[in-house]
Amino acid sequence: MANSSVLNRSRQILPVLSLLAGLIGSTVTAAGEGPGLQTIPPGYHLVASETGVPAEALYSVSLAETSRKLPNGERPWPWTLNVAGKGYRYNTRQEAYDALLSFMRRYPLKRIDVGIAQVNLGWNGRYFSSYWEALEPYTNLRVAARILKSCYDSNPGSWIQAAGCYHHPAGGKPARTYKAIVKRKLATLDLSTPVSYAELQLARIPSPQRHLLPQNRELQWVEPRESRQ
C-alpha cells in the first residue's frame, strides 16, 4: 500500500470522499432487507447500460478486486495496483501513476493489474490509449465490462461463472475461489433500489468537469487536477 500514516491517509481521503460521484455510493437499509446493504452506485448502472453487463456483476467484481474500508463502508478503490500478486492502494491517481511507471521498469506488464477493476496491462493493455488512461475509473470499468462480457458470451448462462473467467480464464481453483468471493460481495448489495435519472446524468459528466459541480453532492466523482502522460 502507499506508505503513509493512518492519520495522513484519513486526511487525504476524506476530502476526496466529499466529492464522490458515480462509482462510490452509500450504505442503506432497504425495506425488507438486512442492515447495511449497499446500493449500486450510478456509474456502474451507466456502464451496464452501455455494455450489456449487469450493474451488480460489475460492482461485485470491482468489490472483489479493489475493496477498501472507507468512512462510508467498504468500496472499490480506483487508485489500486497489483504487482506480482501484491496489492498497493494509493490516495490519488497521480500517486498510483507514478508508482505504476516505477513498477513497469521492474516487472513485465503481465504481472501488473491496474485500476478500479484491476485490468491486466499485459493481456488487455491494448484497450487503453495510455497508462494514465488505464487509471481513469470509468475507462477502466468499461474495459473490464468488455472482458467480462466476452467471458459470458463464450459460456452463457451465469455472470458468476463469467467472473471466474475474468479472474482466471483457465479456470480451476483460482477461478472457483474468486467466484466464491464475488458471490459474497453480491450478497451485500441492495438490488431493489433503482438508480434515478438525475444520478445517471451526473455519472455522464466527463471527469475533468466534475470539480465544477457543488462540492456537497454526495455522488460526485472528482479526478486529480494534475495529469502526467
Q: Residue locations for each model-derived region?
A:
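N-terminal secretory targeting signals
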Residues: 1-53, 180, 184-229
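Catalytic glycan-binding domains that act on GlcNAc-containing polysaccharides
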Residues: 32-192
